[in-house]
């Protein structure tokens, strides 16, 4: 269903986003270091399948994804190499842009880690010293 909606929007000139990628289990207090632990099988079958169908079924030229606030295990999803590079880009052939969810003043979306591990753009701002590129 998502791929069809994205394709319909793209025909009208809309740049579709899939979000929140992935394991976004709760909205209440989601910025308070929500850590989600799950087996790879659970993640692939329960959390990623809908995203996979959307990515593989999209027929347009431009697509984007927004990473979620939560952590997958001990790694923020916005800096999760396995999720963003290995699965999304590698296995599924995603060629679009990946953006973080809003990075207010939470302090854990470290730009250097995000960019090195598959995010292309930081949404919002953070003036924390930890949020500077090192190279």
What function would you assign to each model-found segment?
Residues 1-135:
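Glycoside hydrolase catalytic-domain context in secreted enzymes
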